[in-house]
Amino acid sequence: MAAAFSSTVGAPASTPTNFLGKKLKKQVTSAVNYHGKSSNINRFKVMAKELDEGKQTDQDRWKGLAYDISDDQQDITRGKGFVDSLFQAPTGDGTHEAVLSSYEYLSQGLRTYDFDNTMGGFYIAPAFMDKLVVHISKNFMTLPNIKVPLILGIWGGKGQGKSFQCELVFAKMGINPIMMSAGELESGNAGEPAKLIRQRYREAADIIKKGKMCCLFINDLDAGAGRMGGTTQYTVNNQMVNATLMNIADNPTNVQLPGMYNKEDNPRVPIIVTGNDFSTLYAPLIRDGRMEKFYWAPTRDDRVGVCKGIFRTDNVPDEDIVKIVDSFPGQSIDFFGALRARVYDDEVRKWVSDTGVENIGKRLVNSREGPPEFEQPKMTIEKLMEYGYMLVKEQENVKRVQLAEQYLSEAALGDANSDAMKTGSFYGQGAQQAGNLPVPEGCTDPVAKNFDPTARSDDGSCLYTF
């Protein structure tokens, strides 16, 4: 008995019509020519009817597409219920708000920039911002027959805000730079710093390749690659750092890692370096074709503008800020930040006395209460001037005493306390600040007849022979 079987070739399609839509019609043909043979098996093919917007019903889930003019970003919940929740963005997060006005969309979904010289309430010097923005922009442009220096060297006095001003400009331009410091320009392994510079450069190039502006930012280049006199040793790594930066400046689109070579060009990455004295660097590195140099010396207006940003939350009047800046003309901008920090010393001292010295560690490091919170101290011009003169006096002590020379020339401590003795701040004052400790009184003048070497506070009983 022959086995019975049926073939599915030429059989009608088993796809349900509901899957293809409710408004689709079926056409039946009487005869189909199939592989040269005539077949009378019924066949159908699916055809979409012409769209008639007037005949659409509420049952059609895509009815709104015919006349939809909304923005997809603002109407993001259109597919709610039809898309797996795994692929739905969380509501209330940026542009995923269900209802957004055009202003909200611009402010949350798009990054917009203003063209003033402030960032987050901080002042950016116009000359500084101009130099940095122009240099970065030029390196991303194709200028006809122009060789643009790859490196911008910003140098000047200590504490003048070079690094901080750079960070403000980067933030204003929407740049997240690849950072390096002078401490990474030396290593126990020969060649490591030069390799690291190339790696960081290529990391920045990869970010640019992905469509986001980036740059390489090296802090205090002269401290890591410069020669500071006879006390510093010039190593192979110093030579290779200078040579690597020179090579990158000459071939910015062909930066290769050691041990490999890739013919594909990498994007050009502008390099920003800061320092205090570029005369310590290798001279061919700082020539004009490779490095564009910018000497940063803030003017009085720049100093006032930066100080307004420092004291912006302290309600210090502008005229008082101007008076403080004019009272300390030879100080760096960093001096005024340290001056503001000194005002909080009184608050911290009061907190320490209330907490107890033995409980400071438990309260600050291992406490459920969290760090202490202070009320903002009132900053008056008198208090700021007082602390300012204290800082200046400490600076003068460092310059005047110079204990290092005495330590190198003498085996013992020597006359390390002679300066304090001459100024009258050695005897008595340190012991009197300790609170209720017993202070032996007596004559503390070595010239007096009844000089008492054990006395720590002068009681006015000194006798002199004339």
UniProtKB/Swiss-Prot annotation:
Pfam families linked: AAA, RuBisCO_activase_AAA_helical
Binding site for ATP: 156-163
SUPFAM superfamilies xrefs: P-loop containing nucleoside triphosphate hydrolases
Span of chain positions assigned to the transit peptide in the UniProt entry: 1-48
Organism: Oryza sativa subsp. japonica
Protein name, UniProt field: Ribulose bisphosphate carboxylase/oxygenase activase, chloroplastic
Key words of the record: ATP-binding, Chloroplast, Nucleotide-binding, Plastid, Transit peptide
Any one Gene Ontology molecular-function term assigned to this protein's record: ATP binding
Function in brief: Activation of RuBisCO (ribulose-1,5-bisphosphate carboxylase/oxygenase; EC 4.1.1.39) involves the ATP-dependent carboxylation of the epsilon-amino group of lysine leading to a carbamate structure.
Family: Belongs to the RuBisCO activase family.
Compartments where found: Plastid, Chloroplast stroma
Ranges in coiled-coil conformation: none
Region (Disordered), start-end ranges: 429-454
Gene Ontology cellular component terms for the protein in this record: chloroplast stroma
Gene name for this UniProt entry: RCA
Gene3D superfamilies in alphabetical order: 1.10.8.1070, P-loop containing nucleotide triphosphate hydrolases
